[in-house]
């Protein structure tokens, strides 16, 4: 298996393309100059395209991914109705979802042969919209509205329109600020990192009564932490055994173990990392974690070790200015 790591640096308007080997070493392959401040990125389900959101001219750009070395070539672009904060796709590669924190909306752009062609829906009134997360069955889009302490739930129609479900939302505790999410591989649980109180909520997608329920809320900060809480990103290993979340004020990655059924998290430790870690990701083997320091202008590679999933630093690398996003592609 070959793996390519992409890092987005908006201040220098660059995407760095790296080869990741089996020992956890990165080798720089390409630096792409992007026409705008590049922030969120996602790889298409068929691994042929990288979609990125740029500002201040709000657009989604599509880059073709070379199958042999992961090199990027610009392919297409499409306008967006707000500044892109988060970007994702459905599992069939038919639609791109973009959440906009500043505009308070989520948009759906149709893909044709992997390329963005037209905007098909926009849902407004999502104050502080910070991500759009499709469930593993490709039916429900979970959209955290950070400023409203709620996660809105939409059914994705065949033509890409979003229809509010019943119930139309679930609520966090007041002042939590739901931000980013991941789903357990067993499709039964979702995990949401809350920016403003640096906690993680565990959501049972459907209990026997057909309801969505928060079954656990866990503080992700050390007991002696007293500064402003400012959580950012969350990811789970492919086997569902280890979960990680980061806080930018503390420059920490919190390590969680996940119970076998996915319902319970336990804090295993805290890993100091790059200054102000805005984004990170886990490789497809579940062996390495790559974190970006928005203020250090570096990325760091960690090996995921032992039954607890603790992190051991393997190396750090200079990237562009203000790196914010990391994605990994395997082929």
UniProtKB/Swiss-Prot annotation:
HAMAP family: 6P_gluconolactonase. InterPro entries: 6-phosphogluconolactonase_YbhE (IPR022528), Cycloisomerase_2 (IPR050282), Lactonase_7-beta_prop (IPR019405), N2O_reductase_N (IPR011045), WD40/YVTN_repeat-like_dom_sf (IPR015943). One of its GO terms (molecular function) is 6-phosphogluconolactonase activity. The keyword Hydrolase applies. This is 6-phosphogluconolactonase. Keywords: Carbohydrate metabolism, Glucose metabolism, Hydrolase. The keyword Cytoplasm does not apply. Pathway: Carbohydrate degradation; pentose phosphate pathway; D-ribulose 5-phosphate from D-glucose 6-phosphate (oxidative stage): step 2/3. Catalyzes the hydrolysis of 6-phosphogluconolactone to 6-phosphogluconate. Coiled coil: none annotated. It comes from the Bacteria. It catalyses: 6-phospho-D-glucono-1,5-lactone + H2O = 6-phospho-D-gluconate + H(+). Its EC number is 3.1.1.31. GO terms for cellular component: cytosol. SUPFAM superfamilies: Nitrous oxide reductase, N-terminal domain. Belongs to the cycloisomerase 2 family. GO terms for biological process: glucose metabolic process; pentose-phosphate shunt, oxidative branch.
